[in-house]
Amino acid sequence: AMPPAERVKFMPMTDLKTYPNAMKPAWNNNGLSQGMCGSVFIVGKQWKEWEGRLAVGYAGIGIHGTPTGNRIDILDISKDGKSAKREELLWPTFAGRFRHVSLDHQGNLYVADEASGMIYKVTPQ
């Protein structure tokens, strides 16, 4: 429960002192304390510009300015893996904690919510 600005001093996302040749992250969560709880690459023409992007679910803890979960990001990772653009999905639901995202064989996206015990099917508009 350490404030993010303090925690980063002790727990950098990539420790370049210990691992100077490590690949730097293409994206980070802006210092927020939200655990990534599952991700999947989106497959299927029905997703249009999102096909091939990474869907990531979060389980935020709601302290030090960090929102609770109920968030899915769609990451467009560059071909060289050195950068990414983020698009946040807006959910017309309660504040839950998304625990996992998954695709079925038809390319439908499913999201598991810890608070409600529900699994939501997400389809493109």
Language model features by range: what are they?
Residues 1-87, 106, 122-125:
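Beta-propeller domain segments
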